[in-house]
């Protein structure tokens, strides 16, 4: 049952599946409590109900459109996402964004471990610490088993999530003043853009690993069907969760922040139903956190392989890498639980500054400059066309981060030009388009020798 492949090329003989598997994975993976908490932040931080929901949806669609373009690279090239960055940054140069991606995976996994640990503790009548440790052990097992098990988990998560969310929505709305919610409608540009940033950053954060879960699809699979499956799966799943978060925060007020799990479980009208909701929370977090653990294993493997010059990984190394990343997440979760909500908000928004220019460079290069042509064997050999470092791409990546800094409005970082946009954080828009335009306009300085068509390993 355990997956044999890691970051190496998936030959056509091992390809399988249908684009709809992407829908169930991203739909089910986003029906979970961290997305609920993120949606709630739009209200907790001052937004109204109506325009928070609209802003979240706008952000979902913007971020998911970019994310889905990354997903198309998986079936076309048969490789996980981050090793493809070597085509733009060089074999060693790709380590720069890879290290940041690993930090992101650890952060998301840690936040998920905090919330899942609370639910696991209630479900099994154990301490929060024990709940987090058991949850982390489950994540290790599933991440080691790999691709097929993760997709099966996504299908189950879709079913469990739909049932749990339908119940929670009905219970919440039956006890609420719907008229008051509908009239909670006072547009404010700062809080609207905050909602857009929350959801767009959520989606863009998936870009570094989305093709990890599409790379086994047949090479000739429909690009339109694949794009739509990822797009609608992640938008519908995340918007459902964030809508529940907005409504819950608006109804519960100060009773929700810091008590997210207990409040949602309180929607259960009996002990049995409360246990079902605890289970649904745990199951949803298992799916989502497994995506992060598997992605972190892929990224760490890509970093190590740059220096070892081989992409095949033994089962022992696979287990060791997964254990290392999950353990790091668990330790952070154990140390940061009391301040979870505050720190997670800052972390999620600040991540945009580092992943927006990476995404812009990768997509601009793949779709507009390389025209989808990648020399796959050269990705593992710095002596070939992609070299050790591509200073052109690395320089523009740094520029892409820097041009965002004056426009960032975040407790972790605040700069001087946010007044132009009434104190709103629009750095991600400036960073993505600015980096993409610069990368394309200055392409004559790129010294790579690009292939006329994709070159695949002999199998």
Name each model-derived stretch.
Residues 1-49, 191-197, 215-225, 446-459:
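Membrane-interface "cap" regions at the ends of multi-pass membrane proteins
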Residues 32-35, 58-66, 101-110, 142, ...:
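Selective recognition of specific alpha-helical transmembrane segments in multi-pass small-molecule
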Residues 43-54, 118-132, 148-157, 263-269, ...:
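Transmembrane helix-loop boundary segments of multi-pass membrane transporters
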Residues 82-86, 113-130, 218, 292-323, ...:
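Helix-loop-helix connectors at the membrane interface of multi-pass transporters/channels
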Residues 303-338, 385-405:
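Loop-to-transmembrane helix boundary motifs in multi-pass membrane proteins
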Residues 358-438:
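C-terminal membrane-solvent junction of multi-pass transporters and transport-like membrane proteins
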């Amino acid at each position: 049952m355990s997956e044999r492949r890691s970051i190496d090329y998936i030959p056509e003989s091992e390809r399988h599946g249908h684009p709809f598997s992407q829908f169930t994975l991203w739909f089910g993976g986003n029906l979970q409590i961290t997305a609920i908490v993120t949606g709630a932040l739009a209200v907790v931080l001052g937004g109204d109900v109506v325009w928070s929901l609209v802003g979240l949806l706008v952000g979902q669609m913007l971020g998911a459109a970019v994310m889905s373009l990354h997903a198309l690279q998986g079936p076309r090239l048969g490789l996980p996402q981050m090793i493809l960055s070597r085509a733009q940054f060089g074999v060693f140069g790709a380590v720069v964004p890879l290290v940041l991606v690993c930090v992101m995976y650890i952060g998301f996994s840690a936040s998920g471990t905090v919330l899942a640990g609370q639910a696991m503790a209630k479900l099994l009548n154990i301490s929060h610490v024990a709940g987090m440790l058991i949850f982390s052990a489950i994540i290790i097992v599933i991440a080691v088993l790999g691709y097929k098990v993760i997709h099966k988990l996504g299908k189950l998560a879709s079913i469990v999530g739909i049932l749990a969310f339908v119940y929670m929505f009905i219970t919440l709305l039956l006890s609420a003043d719907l008229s008051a919610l509908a009239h909670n409608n006072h547009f404010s540009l700062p809080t609207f853009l905050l909602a857009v940033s929350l959801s767009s950053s959520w989606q863009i954060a998936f870009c570094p690993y989305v093709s990890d879960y599409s790379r086994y699809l047949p090479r000739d699979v429909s690009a339109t069907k694949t794009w739509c499956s990822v797009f609608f799966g992640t938008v519908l799943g995340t918007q459902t969760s964030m809508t529940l978060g907005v409504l819950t925060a608006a109804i519960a007020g100060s009773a929700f922040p810091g008590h997210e799990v207990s409040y949602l479980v309180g929607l259960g009208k009996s002990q049995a139903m409360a246990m079902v909701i605890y289970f649904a929370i745990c199951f949803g977090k298992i799916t989502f956190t497994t995506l992060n653990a598997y992605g972190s294993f892929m990224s760490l493997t890509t970093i190590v392989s740059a220096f070892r010059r081989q992409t095949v990984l033994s089962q022992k190394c696979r287990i060791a890498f997964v254990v290392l990343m999950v353990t790091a997440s668990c330790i952070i979760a154990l140390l940061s639980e009391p301040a979870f909500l505050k720190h997670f908000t800052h972390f999620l928004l600040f991540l945009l500054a580092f992943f927006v220019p990476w995404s812009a460079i990768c997509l601009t290069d793949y779709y507009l400059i390389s025209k989808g042509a990648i020399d796959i064997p050269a990705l593992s050999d710095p002596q070939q066309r992609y070299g050790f470092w591509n200073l052109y791409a690395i320089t523009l990546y740094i520029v892409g981060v820097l041009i965002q800094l004056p426009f960032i409005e975040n407790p972790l970082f605040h700069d001087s030009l946010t007044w132009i946009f009434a104190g709103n954080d629009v750095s991600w828009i400036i960073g993505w388009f600015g980096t993409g335009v610069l990368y394309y306009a200055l392409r004559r300085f790129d010294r790579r020798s690009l292939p006329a068509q994709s070159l695949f390993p002999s199998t």
